[in-house]
Amino acid sequence: MTVTIYHNPACGTSRNTLAMIRNAGIEPTVVEYLKNPPSRAELEAMIAAAGLTVRQAIREKGTPFAELGLGDPSRSDEELLDAMLEHPILINRPFVVAPLGTRLCRPSEVVLDILPDTHKGPFSKEDGEAVLDAGGKRIV
């Protein structure tokens, strides 16, 4: 199974998502999107496949969102995409692309919806929150 995660190693949600993928016995393709951003076509395809609008896929916190005036509702999807490609930190994360679907995995356990049920035992997030029980079954 080919799974790709658009990952930011500085983000706890992204790290937890990556760990859950690996807990399912899958070694994903890891794209550090701040260093290697997706193309416009890839970004548009991910957003559409996840069932999101461009505005729903943009990250506000810790980004130049406000200073670029991206909260203005008159800004078009094209303008938002341009900003996301120029400033990849504006791309919300982590996006995961898998044969079972594409999701923006916030919260991280959303990734479980698009992974096979092959989890190995219990799993807890970095903060200690239990996500999978000893049998690999979802708790949350």
From Swiss-Prot:
Pfam families per record: ArsC
Record note on disruption phenotype: Disruption mutant shows selective sensitivity to arsenate. Does not affect sensitivity to antimonate [Sb(V)].
GO biological process, one term: response to arsenic-containing substance
TM stretches of this protein: none
PROSITE patterns, sorted: ARSC (PS51353)
Site annotation Important for activity. Lowers pKa of the active site Cys: residues: H7
Active site: C11 (nucleophile)
EC id: 1.20.4.1
Annotated InterPro entries: Arsenate_reductase (IPR006659), Arsenate_reductase-like (IPR006660), Thioredoxin-like_sf (IPR036249)
The keyword Oxidoreductase belongs to this UniProt entry's keyword annotation: yes
SUPFAM superfamilies hit by this protein: Thioredoxin-like
MF (Gene Ontology): arsenate reductase (glutaredoxin) activity
Family stated for the protein in its record: Belongs to the ArsC family.
Function: Involved in resistance to arsenate. Catalyzes the reduction of arsenate [As(V)] to arsenite [As(III)]. The resulting arsenite is then extruded from the cell via the aquaglyceroporin AqpS. Does not display antimonate reductase activity.
Protein name: Arsenate reductase
Naturally occurring in which organism (per UniProt): Rhizobium meliloti (strain 1021) (Ensifer meliloti)
Name of the coding gene: arsC
